[in-house]
Amino acid sequence: RAARVVTAPKYPGGTNALYAFLRENMCKPQIAIETAGYGTTTVQFIVTRNGEVVGADYKRRCNERVDKEVLRLVNMLSGWTPATKGGKPCDAVVQISMSIFPSFNASAQFVGVR
């Protein structure tokens, strides 16, 4: 039974710290804000058993400039506590969705372990 227990990866400081990092480090070029409209960019990535972010790629795109900014931010994330399966660190898939116009909004979702 314990071999099936899975825990999600955790960003240092938790979900609120993750959202604060994204908000505080986001560059909002004026043209991106003007052209983004209402849309969300979703990036999926792997948090490795070492807590590193690898393989970030788009799942949903909104606007080229906004998409690039979300991908840049995701690639800056580091220091995760890895997911575990059966008490052992393992790779995990995570998705982050962000919109920046008309206001910042973000959500993170644990997809599963690998």
Each model region followed by its residue ranges:
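Charge-biased low-complexity segments
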Residues: 1-114
